[in-house]
Amino acid sequence: MKKAGTFTDLFAYASQAPVIFAESLWFNLTLGANIARDKVLEVCEKLDLISLVKEKGFEYYLGNNADQLSGGQLERIELARAILANRPILLLDEINASLDKKTSDEIHQYLLNSNLTFVEVIHHYNNDELSEYDGIIDLNDYRSN
């Protein structure tokens, strides 16, 4: 009998309050997993992190230097980490909170056009943007009076 997977085997998580380790950019992206450099570069390109990689390099230490990065860069590092974890489902909590509209739109187009399965919590949106999602649960519909 096969043992059921654990929660961490099924889900990867990215939030508006990213966890950044006092380690290299590479470690923060991969958590030490054996991931091909080409795959990491591809995800960095899609999430608009490639300029950071080219400027600082993967060995850039994010200890005290993390405060030199923008909130949007930190969120994108955590999102890249979640994607690179290669879990069946991504749980995304307000991943665009610190992103400008253009970057947010580009990242959402990447996610929507990918084969990734994700559940996303969003609070601020335009109704026309929601038409691209497979399903929507509006928690206001379940609010008790």
Tell where the protein language model's regions lie, with residue ranges.
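ABC-family ATPase nucleotide-binding domain "signature/switch" substructure
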Residues: A17, N28, Y61-N145
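Short helix-terminating capping/connector loops at secondary-structure junctions
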Residues: F7, V53-E55, L92
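ABC ATPase nucleotide-binding domain signature region
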Residues: M1-N34, I122-H124, L130
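Conserved "ABC signature" C-loop
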Residues: P18-Y61
